[in-house]
Amino acid sequence: MASNIKEQAKKQFELNGQSYTYYDLQTLEEKGLAKISKLPYSIRVLLESVLRQEDDFVITDDHIKALSKFGNAGNEGEVPFKPSRVILQDFTGVPAVVDLASLRKAMNDVGGDINKINPEVPVDLVIDHSVQVDSYANPEALERNMKLEFERNYERYQFLNWATKAFDNYNAVPPATGIVHQVNLEYLANVVHVRDVDGEKTAFPDTLVGTDSHTTMINGIGVLGWGVGGIEAEAGMLGQPSYFPIPEVIGVRLTHSLPQGSTATDLALRVTEELRKKGVVGKFVEFFGPGVQHLPLADRATIANMAPEYGATCGFFPVDEESLKYMKLTGRDEEHIELVKEYLQQNHMFFDVEKEDPEYTDVIDLDLSTVEASLSGPKRPQDLIFLSDMKKEFEKSVTAPAGNQGHGLDQSEFDKKAEINFNDGSKATMKTGDIAIAAITSCTNTSNPYVMLGAGLVAKKAVEKGLKVPEFVKTSLAPGSKVVTGYLRDSGLQQYLDDLGFNLVGYGCTTCIGNSGPLLPEIEKAVADEDLLVTSVLSGNRNFEGRIHPLVKANYLASPQLVVAYALAGTVDIDLQNEPIGKGKDGKDVYLQDIWPSIQEVSDTVDKVVTPELFLEEYKNVYHNNEMWNEIDVTDEPLYDFDPNSTYIQNPTFFQGLSKEPGKIEPLKSLRVMGKFGDSVTTDHISPAGAIGKDTPAGKYLLDHDVAIRNFNSYGSRRGNHEVMVRGTFANIRIKNQLAPGTEGGFTTYWPTGEIMPIYDAAMKYKEDGTGLVVLAGNDYGMGSSRDWAAKGTNLLGVKTVIAQSYERIHRSNLVMMGVLPLQFQQGESAEALGLDGKEEISVDINEDVQPHDFVNVTAKKENGEIINFKAIVRFDSLVELDYYRHGGILQMVLRNKLAQ
């Protein structure tokens, strides 16, 4: 039943002869609950959501009142967030849809109504994560890679296609269309929804969650959204809210404008560095100030995209005139654009730089005119390097101690060379710092016509000067939508990119997520034989160790323009601002400034070729634009027929033996330590997305099931099969488990025998005798992708608790939703400080009385009988997380609730 507050807030406005209902935030000010003009715009969007969806059960007056007091009472309370839609990509989307199919089967098995297992909000899945760069630097690369993609993934695509027929409210955008976040920005996002609610046309803000951490990109157009784990997204699809504490909102005041030579990429990398230093994990970031009006929407989207890299839940740009201009540019309906403006102005959510600034938790100032051309690396996006310092910083990193900013090698590394004899008879020499991969990739940048056309102009000037890319550099161009192909073609710049080897290889994430494909065999052999430190330069958003290619140890993020420039140089061991890139056809040195376009040149090109007609043409038949997809043969049966022999799609074991009622929270006793890790362990480390080695537990499983090595595909592509994924948990070739000294990769010591073995093998031995497991970790545990399998795999290995110094937001949430207890060391304490070496038996004194952020007693019993006692913080961040944990996970809770209805 709706409350008095909600009823009083219900208002109407008229537009073009049509009446619209909306829930007026000003009502809260009239009732003395909030000063709306002082609230950050992102908080206004959340407040509208709880006001409109208040039902006096899940969302109550107390939630409205708590959020209305933002900034006045230490932000106490929690937000039940029910987004208006959900987006998925195929790597995380397949396991989400598998879980829905499994939930439906479980419902059927106990005699329940399977129609209760249907998305209750619109769901769009965009297939973008599976294409790999096998073929490149040739005109046929796109077709060859797409053909291989369908061959490798036919069974997965058949399953996803089946789901479009089996589930309501579910659509799939076919392969070779684009990258989910770019498709979302250019086409899917409405900015304001109009839906029929109780017979009334009701207007409200577009909001979403997505199963990819870079879902945050959509905040660039003023749509509030962020990445969640697949499990949380599934709960959202089924009508369950996400709960989180009322966030702090850090305001970033932008002034002035970007100078000549700097790009949106440079700004995004600078913002990432500044906000990482500030510490914004779990917080909202909102951009305001006079500099905002100097940022085209595409630049805002680039900055918003990298919110996971700066650690924030989102980086929000409120809707303003520039947002409407972008909607018009991308072919959105004129009447709808008019509605967006009218509604947001009526409801105090339309940004105007002339209005008074909101009151933020804290404010950071950033002068856009101070942004310099930059890269970041070699192993983390927040490690900013000015272009002018790149040569010096690279050389320093080679001999710096092994870690986030060093490789731990000695000076002799600079004397190494690898001689390459190509199959065509030509030869080349690679040395330390040479570039093996140069990729224009990722929605972070390919959604931005300014940097993409800028890269095309760099290529044009380079070709005209007679510059060429060395033969050992693997070049690729993988845009996030077909619109990019259209404007590069129409501008005449694609031919120059082609001349340098940046041919179109596919529409998808490719190199940015580790789908860079193989290097030439002769290069791989030479680099491996010499153990040469080679590099990559990519226009992506992540460069974590081991992510881009197993043989490439140093990876640098840069703008598409700099990717082209570095590809031409062939090395990162160069001062591009002062040293020549190469010699032109006239024999003269060519410098970066000789091939760099002016801001005006780029802007004029964008104005000329980026048109609404282009967007309308490319998106007019978006769900059926791929003939190979349309021809997939699928059944329309509502229950999926799991094939026991499939190595891609299996019915997971999460619901096996599920009781009708949840159990009680009980102490954890005599756990053994399976992993002890340092800082910055990423979800890539925990659950890799890339290649499956033949000698790994996952590789052996596939061989045992008659899968040839060439058909292994990647971990990411096999996320619908829990048997592969549990074997791949903690299996990244670069992860360093301190319990298996002298090894790199997924190994541990099995304490009963002292034997070093694969983590999966040890976990299964522990499971046989009923021993639970624990993981010890440092700061920022679980940073990176919103990879639910990092938590699912942890659960299936038998890990009962993780004890870390700090967590990245999404992974902590995912652990709880998989029934794994996240504990946090007290400030100043760590495994090392407490003297824990991993050989201990760990017990945790937790019970039904536990509350969010309580302290619990942890006991560590050493081999000699010595006892170490310490207190750890229970990282349940809301009351509902207690229920998730009690049920053994959120999906188990959803199933029990649906059965009880």
UniProtKB/Swiss-Prot annotation:
Statement: the UniProt record of this protein carries the keyword Calcium: no
Molecular-function GO term, any one: mRNA 3'-UTR binding
Residues where [4Fe-4S] cluster binds: C443, C509, C512
Cofactor note (record): Binds 1 [4Fe-4S] cluster per subunit.
GO biological process: propionate metabolic process, methylcitrate cycle; tricarboxylic acid cycle
Pathway assigned to this chain's UniProt record: Carbohydrate metabolism; tricarboxylic acid cycle; isocitrate from oxaloacetate: step 2/2; Organic acid metabolism; propanoate degradation
Keywords for the protein's UniProt record, in alphabetical order: Iron, Iron-sulfur, Lyase, Metal-binding, RNA-binding, Tricarboxylic acid cycle
Signal sequence segment: none
PROSITE patterns in the record: ACONITASE_1, ACONITASE_2
InterPro entries with a match to the protein in the record: AcnA_IRP_Swivel, Acnase/IPM_dHydase_lsu_aba_1/3, Acoase/IPM_deHydtase_lsu_aba, Aconitase/3IPM_dehydase_swvl, Aconitase/IRP2, Aconitase_4Fe-4S_BS, Aconitase_4Fe-4S_dom, AconitaseA/IPMdHydase_ssu_swvl
Domain of life per record: Bacteria
Cofactor(s) the protein needs: [4Fe-4S] cluster
Family: Belongs to the aconitase/IPM isomerase family.
Protein task: Involved in the catabolism of short chain fatty acids (SCFA) via the tricarboxylic acid (TCA)(acetyl degradation route) and probably the 2-methylcitrate cycle I (propionate degradation route). Catalyzes the reversible isomerization of citrate to isocitrate via cis-aconitate. Could catalyze the hydration of 2-methyl-cis-aconitate to yield (2R,3S)-2-methylisocitrate. The apo form of AcnA functions as a RNA-binding regulatory protein.
Record's subunit section: Monomer.
Protein's name in the database: Aconitate hydratase A
